[in-house]
From Swiss-Prot:
Lineage: superkingdom: Eukaryota
Organism lineage: Eukaryota, Metazoa, Ecdysozoa, Arthropoda, Hexapoda
Acetylation in keyword set: no
Signal peptide (UniProt feature, chain positions): 1-23
Family under the similarity heading: Belongs to the MCD family. Mastoparan subfamily.
Modified residues (Leucine amide): L59
Localization of this protein: Secreted; Target cell membrane
AXPX repeats (start-end): 27-30, 31-34, 35-38, 40-43
Protein name in the entry: Mastoparan-VB1
Keyword field: Amidation, Antibiotic, Antimicrobial, Fungicide, G-protein coupled receptor impairing toxin, Immunity, Innate immunity, Mast cell degranulation, Membrane, Repeat, Secreted, Signal, Target cell membrane, Target membrane, Toxin
Organism: Vespa bicolor (Black shield wasp)
Residue ranges annotated as propeptide in the record: 24-45
Amino acid sequence: MKNTILLLFTAFIFLSGFFGMSAEALADPKADPLAGPFPDADPDPINMKASAAVAKKLLG
């Protein structure tokens, strides 16, 4: 029984890789495969010096 489950799991992993399915695609099949990892993310980087200045001003 244990060997059968291991064999089926291994076959599933092999077939998933063979057909080009990633773990994310298996988890969310409706996701756009051409989109980046975070399509709603802000493209501008966070200005750490400005953030630190605001935090210092707020916290005293």
